[in-house]
Amino acid sequence: MQAIDIGHVTLERDGTGVFSDLTLRLTERRIGIVGRNGAGKSSLIRLITGLVTPQKGRVVVNGVDVAADRAGALGTVGLLFQNPDHQIIFPVVRDEIAFGLEQKGLKRAAALARAEAVLAAQGRADWGDRLCHTLSQGQRQLLCLMSILAMEPDWILFDEPFNALDLPTALSIEARIAGLAQNVVLVTHDPSRLTGFDRILWLEGGRIEADGPPAEVLPRYIAAMQALARAGAC
């Protein structure tokens, strides 16, 4: 079974407590995470990908301790950042996609061939020689997604992927996410993006405020946010 197991995790960042004894098991194919700024959403997905290491406890994804086994984590879980410019390293599209594959152990020629195959599969065979900085925001977001898909992870996590995108581009990315074979964890401020999801986590101040099906969690979340807006507390 595909599973993310978060066991008794305590996390502090810059001297501030984020999570205390957090325990979760995630097995659903489509999981949404909502919450206000500072609730711990981004910290949670960085824990799941192994980008941050907890002071206590551990995170295991499909049997891989993601903080202890970085090589294993690369083939198990991928993360699409909110801003693609925080993710793109190389100036040329082909090299950007090939980089992660080389980190997994592929030889340079095999990694480049795999990059070309991924581009072709996504209808972007003509992108290989393009400079990353010439791509639009939405195109750079797609490049980051293709780089993740090339790694063939079991889980793909998305941290506010629709921010700064115009509506047509956001809808295009949303459709691509919906069509993914991988398990998906999506962080968003927009509950409408979570239609058809299997499970919703509502984070509040580093704790789980609610956890369950969208029909149960999202109305409570929306009502709470509306109440805060009326009170001028947001």
Curated annotation (Swiss-Prot):
What's a single GO MF annotation on this record?
Answer: ATP binding
Keyword Nucleotide-binding part of the UniProt annotation? yes
Gene Ontology CC annotation, any one: ATP-binding cassette (ABC) transporter complex
Q: Report the outcome of K41N.
A: Diminished biotin uptake, loss of ATPase activity, BioMNY complexes still form
List where in the cell it is found. Cell inner membrane
Which keywords appear in this protein's UniProt record, sorted alphabetically? Answer: ATP-binding, Cell inner membrane, Cell membrane, Membrane, Nucleotide-binding, Translocase, Transport
Recorded hits in Gene3D superfamilies, A to Z, give: P-loop containing nucleotide triphosphate hydrolases
Q: Which residues bind ATP?
A: G35, R36, N37, G38, A39, G40, K41, S42
What the entry lists under PROSITE patterns is as follows: ABC_TRANSPORTER_2 (PS50893)
Membrane topology per record: Peripheral membrane protein
Which intervals hold domain ABC transporter?
A: 1-230
Among the Pfam families in the record, one is: ABC_tran
Tell me yes or no: is Cell membrane among this UniProt entry's keywords.
Answer: yes
Query: In the Enzyme Commission scheme, what number(s) does this protein have?
Result: 7.6.2.-
Similarity comment text for this entry: Belongs to the ABC transporter superfamily.
Q: Which PANTHER family match?
A: ENERGY-COUPLING FACTOR TRANSPORTER ATP-BINDING PROTEIN ECFA1, HEAVY METAL TRANSPORTER
Q: What is the annotated quaternary arrangement, including any partners? A: Part of a biotin transporter holocomplex composed of BioM, BioN and BioY. BioMN complexes can be readily purified, but not BioMY complexes. Only the BioMNY complex has ATPase activity.
Function statement: Required for biotin uptake under very low (pM) biotin concentrations but not under higher (nM) concentrations.
Its name, as the record gives it, is Biotin transport ATP-binding protein BioM
Q: Which gene encodes it?
A: bioM
